[in-house]
């Protein structure tokens, strides 16, 4: 499945929640009718079956993290192999992606922008350039902006935006040095309560 390149607000309206695809810190529901489906007047939402609800939740999480269908299924398979709660393992794997960590540290205004920084070789992990967005970050890894990329206006703008967001407790960021440490994997209580990972587990368990 190809990556969606259309209007970001349209995706959030389709899912009925803010997917944090735009760079602003103001909630999207203050910018558009988030509860109204895309279309001139908003299509009436049909009553979903249990399968439909599960599928919609999977699509929502997949879009939040910008992961393609095959990648997402592979993350689920890996999460199921790990010890512990499969749903929580899945979220931890998604949060551990390099592009997501770059976003969480405030170096990219959105996950899409963070992914672009990674692919353009502007990001280093433990002093080495890594240009794979799905690269898994481990506890105590140091993620930093490459020296020649530190002057980019988009990085500076992203750091200013990040000052207005709640800082993740599992990360330690030095905005001046443009580097941060992935102290630990996030716990479920650290992440959005708007995600129901149990629905995704139910979907893939069938």
From Swiss-Prot:
Disulfide bridge partners, by residue number: none
| Gene3D superfamilies (UniProt xref) | Ribosomal Protein S4 Delta 41, Chain A, domain 1 (1.10.1050.10), RNA-binding S4 domain (3.10.290.10)
GO molecular function annotation: rRNA binding; structural constituent of ribosome
Pfam families associated with the record: Ribosomal_S4 (PF00163), S4 (PF01479)
S4 RNA-binding domain location is 96-156
Q: Does the entry feature the keyword Metal-binding, yes or no? A: no
Keyword set includes Ribonucleoprotein: yes
Q: Which GO terms describe its cellular component?
A: small ribosomal subunit
A GO BP annotation: ribosomal small subunit biogenesis
Instruction: For this UniProt record, give its keywords in alphabetical order, as a comma-separated list.
Output: Ribonucleoprotein, Ribosomal protein, RNA-binding, rRNA-binding
Which PROSITE patterns does this entry report, sorted A to Z? RIBOSOMAL_S4, S4
- Subunit field text: Part of the 30S ribosomal subunit. Contacts protein S5. The interaction surface between S4 and S5 is involved in control of translational fidelity.
The job of this chain, per UniProt, is described as: One of the primary rRNA binding proteins, it binds directly to 16S rRNA where it nucleates assembly of the body of the 30S subunit. With S5 and S12 plays an important role in translational accuracy.
Do you know which NCBIfam families this protein is assigned to? PRK05327.1, rpsD_bact
| HAMAP family per record | Ribosomal_uS4_B
Entry's family note: Belongs to the universal ribosomal protein uS4 family.
This chain's protein is named Small ribosomal subunit protein uS4
- Give the taxonomic lineage as stored in the record: Bacteria, Pseudomonadati, Pseudomonadota, Gammaproteobacteria, Enterobacterales
């Amino acid at each position: 499945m190809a990556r969606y390149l259309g209007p970001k607000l349209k995706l959030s309206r389709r899912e009925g929640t803010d997917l944090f695809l735009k760079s602003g810190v103001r909630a999207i529901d203050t910018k558009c009718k988030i509860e109204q489906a895309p279309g001139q007047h908003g299509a009436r939402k049909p009553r979903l079956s249990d399968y439909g609800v599960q599928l919609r939740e999977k699509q929502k999480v997949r879009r939040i993290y910008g992961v393609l269908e095959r990648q997402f299924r592979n993350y689920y398979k890996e999460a199921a192999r790990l010890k512990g709660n499969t749903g929580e393992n899945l979220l931890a794997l998604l949060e551990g992606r390099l592009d997501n960590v770059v976003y969480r540290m405030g170096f990219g205004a959105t996950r899409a922008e963070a992914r672009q920084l990674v692919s353009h070789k502007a990001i280093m992990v433990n002093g080495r350039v890594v240009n794979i967005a799905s690269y898994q970050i481990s506890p105590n890894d140091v993620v930093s902006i490459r020296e020649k990329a530190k002057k980019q206006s988009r990085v500076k703008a992203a750091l200013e935006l990040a000052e207005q967001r709640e800082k993740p407790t599992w990360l330690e960021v030095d905005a001046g040095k443009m580097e941060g440490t992935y102290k630990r994997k996030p716990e479920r209580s650290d992440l959005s309560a708007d995600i129901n990972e149990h629905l995704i587990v139910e979907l893939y368990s069938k």
